[in-house]
């Protein structure tokens, strides 16, 4: 029967309107056992979070300046709180890192200007403000970016705030217990038998404080990598494929910023940066991320 065959053939063909509707609605998350809310949370569906709003460029700049001011104010308050005890911190750091400083008169700090002590105290206070200001900067950055972040990304960013402070303290401790003793032992051993070293307060503390602040920032590398991967800005494979470029960048930055002309400090700093970079990638590889 020709009419019966035509009906059967028509029944076997999908309704074009229904096909278009299925394509427009995308995969059935509920049927697959998923939850639409979870998919939105992960950023798998939708164009962006509901809280994301367009703002004029001037409004963005104004908010960014305001949040930067908060970071500077917090750092300044911490610096003012530390300044009264800065001389005690100077004596502690000096006696800790200059070999024989307490017993050898020549190893005591030398002042070659009337304001060197005050300037050094200000630098010590500024270092304390910088270390405390790092997590504040992370938090203010989170508040600035919050409207454009998915809930999952917000959780990651909030968890980064205390992590940033912990990593900064670990970096300062690493500089205090590992980097600085090695550098000053090298300096004193290098000049023994050739000249008597008279350590100037300004130059010596510039090296100490710069390396401490530098290490506080360097130890943020694992945090930056983890955040970038968790927020889908990059992948571990992408970073591993370009590791030599990162190594070269680390070496360049270490030799450019380090105040040590002998090359000892830049090598230690660059080795630390590369170790943190590779260690983070190894941890991600081990956990399957």
Name these PLM-found stretches:
Residues 1-289:
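Membrane topogenic/interface segments and analogous intrinsically disordered interaction regions
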